[in-house]
Every structure is written in structure tokens, then in C-alpha cells.
């Protein structure tokens, strides 16, 4: 839920932010919005290759979520073109690695041979709730504060909560596997 909320928040927030705050044209904002999309597509595939090397799902997911928080945290400094472009690429990398990890998570939790459709129900339920919540959170924070940067900081906090949840999940998985 929290990851998808920030994902949808990003892709609904970014074009409006670019037009309202950075004075881009609507067409320019759409073109810039494609940078993280292209990076995301590439890193979704790379994420699968990384998982096949034996890197654990929780490790990759924690890394991806940390990158995502970093991408959000760079937004207030994105007036500098290098930082702005870097934030788009960093966020795109994270947004590609994260869903790859999430789709691999059910087989990690219940075992690959038992990860049927019901194992994905939780992932999909969280995803769809996040699709609904992300744009509402972004709009709500902007309406409350009148400041788009507050939206970025809100999603840094959401990313932090997601990282904490992922680390807790990793600890629980390790404990279950060791019999504790």
C-alpha cells in the first residue's frame, strides 16, 4: 500500500509540480515525466536478473525503497538541473526494482511451489489501495500546506515507514526460517 501510494503520488504530483512550481509547459512536463518511466522499465528487468543471482528479496526491496526515499528527498533541491535529473533517474531505478521485489515476495513468504493466486491477493489489495491513496495524499498535503515541497517530504516519511516495515518483515522471515 505505502509503496504504491508514493508511486501514484509521484506520477500525479510531478507533472503538476513541474508546471506550477518550475514553470514548464504541460508538454515539457509530460516529456520530463517520461524519464523515470523509461528508467523504471529497464530496472524492472534488471531487478529480476538481480533476484536470480540470489540476492534476497528483502535486501533488494530495502535498497529500492531507500533509493525511492532519496529520490523524493532530492526534490527540494531539484532547481539545479543535475540534481533534478538525478532525482528522476534515482526514483526511476527504485520504481523499477520495487515492483519486481514485491511480485517475488509471495513466493519468498510461502515458498515458490505454494505461491498461487491467493498469495498475490495481499500484494494486489495493497497495490490498489495505494493507487487510490497516493494522489489523494499528494493533493491533500498540497491543499493543507499550499506547498508542493511538503508533498515530497510527506512521501519521504511514507518511504521511511515502508522501509521500517520491510526490515521488520525481513526479521520475521529470518526468525521463522530459523525456528524462533
Q: What positions do the PLM features span?
A:
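A late C-terminal transmembrane helix in Major Facilitator Superfamily
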Residues: 110-147, 155
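Hydrophobic transmembrane alpha-helices of secondary-active solute transporters
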Residues: 2-8, 36, 40, 52, ...
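C-terminal transmembrane helical hairpin of 12-TM major facilitator-type secondary transporters
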Residues: 57-102
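Juxtamembrane helix-start elements in MFS-like secondary transporters
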Residues: 25-33, 84, 116, 120
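Multi-pass alpha-helical transporter architecture, strongest
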Residues: 76, 143, 147, 153-180
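Extracytoplasmic gate region of multi-pass secondary transporters
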Residues: 1-37, 41-44
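Intracellular helix-loop hinge segments at the cytoplasmic ends of transmembrane helices
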Residues: 16, 100-111
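Helix-to-loop junctions at the C-terminal end of transmembrane segments
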Residues: 43-56, 142-143
Amino acid at each position: 500500500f505505502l509503496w504504491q501510494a508514493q508511486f501514484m503520488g509521484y506520477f500525479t504530483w510531478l507533472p503538476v509540480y513541474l508546471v506550477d512550481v518550475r514553470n514548464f509547459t504541460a508538454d515539457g512536463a509530460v516529456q520530463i515525466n517520461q524519464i523515470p518511466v523509461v528508467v523504471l522499465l529497464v530496472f524492472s528487468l534488471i531487478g529480476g536478473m538481480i533476484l536470480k543471482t540470489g540476492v534476497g528479496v528483502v535486501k533488494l526491496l530495502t535498497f529500492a525503497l531507500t533509493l525511492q526515499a532519496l529520490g523524493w528527498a532530492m526534490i527540494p533541491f531539484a532547481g539545479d538541473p543535475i540534481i533534478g535529473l538525478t532525482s528522476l533517474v534515482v526514483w526511476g531505478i527504485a520504481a523499477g526494482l520495487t515492483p519486481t521485489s514485491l511480485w517475488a515476495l509471495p513466493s519468498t513468504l510461502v515458498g515458490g511451489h505454494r505461491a498461487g493466486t491467493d498469495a498475490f491477493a495481499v500484494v494486489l489489495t495493497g497495490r490498489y489501495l495505494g493507487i487510490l491513496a497516493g494522489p489523494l495524499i499528494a493533493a491533500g498535503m498540497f491543499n493543507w500546506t499550499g506547498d508542493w515541497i511538503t508533498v515530497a517530504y510527506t512521501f519521504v516519511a511514507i518511504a521511511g515507514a515502508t522501509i521500517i516495515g520491510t526490515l521488520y518483515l525481513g526479521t520475521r522471515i529470518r526468525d521463522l526460517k530459523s525456528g524462533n
